[in-house]
């Protein structure tokens, strides 16, 4: 038995407006996951970019920490890289870069079928690379598994027998390269003296002083400034000690943190490499 026409009319035409969703006609906007979930799938944190940061700082009276001219701020601002021992990410300037090169035999000829992983001082895009913690003690404790430090792309396309890491010279080679670079630069670089406001003082103190220290000293008209002190006596390297101690007037060598960035970075890496964990 069908419904009467009055019932159809009541259901289809005379439907109360209170049950109708007035917003049902509005189409939901399509939002790309590139925008909504970027930080999740890309493993990158959200960042804010401003057209004119200096103007914004002055307009809203914000405190400017001037990290661009800060030695440690520059180190921490380097790109994040995953290192092979702890499997965690860290700032690139706080790690040891490793490069993949063809292995050479006793006849000093390169063997195309074998690859060798060696430490280097600076990152370069010209070769495949990976990273490990910049610590002599940690590297020494994990040298037995050094073949796992190769880049993933190399591990996936090579056999274990074709990969080589010389564990007997790995630490000494990296240490020698660091010291050679520092000696060469310190031999020709000028001592700026305490005139530079943004400065690093190199000293040689074999007593139980920290390898790196931040001091507050007076400058100019008695205004307090901070300076970093790198104690190269911590390295027990006679050649470096002789270079640093040659100027008896200033009791060390002053470096300009703005003009000697590369040297200061490698000095920091050397002290970090030898620090006790």
Swiss-Prot record:
- Identify the domain of life: Eukaryota
Q: Which GO terms describe its cellular component?
A: matrix side of mitochondrial inner membrane; mitochondrion
Q: Which GO terms describe its biological process?
A: mitochondrial genome maintenance; mitochondrial tRNA 5'-end processing
Question: Which InterPro entries does the entry link to?
Answer: Rrg8 (IPR031415)
Q: Does the keyword Methyltransferase apply?
A: no
Keywords for this entry? Answer: Mitochondrion
Regions that span the bilayer: none
Intracellular or extracellular location(s): Mitochondrion
Q: What happens when the gene is disrupted?
A: Decrease in plasma membrane electron transport.
Q: Does the record carry Mitochondrion as a key word?
A: yes
What else the UniProt entry mentions is:
Present with 2140 molecules/cell in log phase SD medium.
The record describes the protein's role as: Required for respiratory activity and maintenance and expression of the mitochondrial genome.
Q: Which family does it belong to?
A: Belongs to the RRG8 family.
Name of the protein described by the UniProt record:
Required for respiratory growth protein 8, mitochondrial
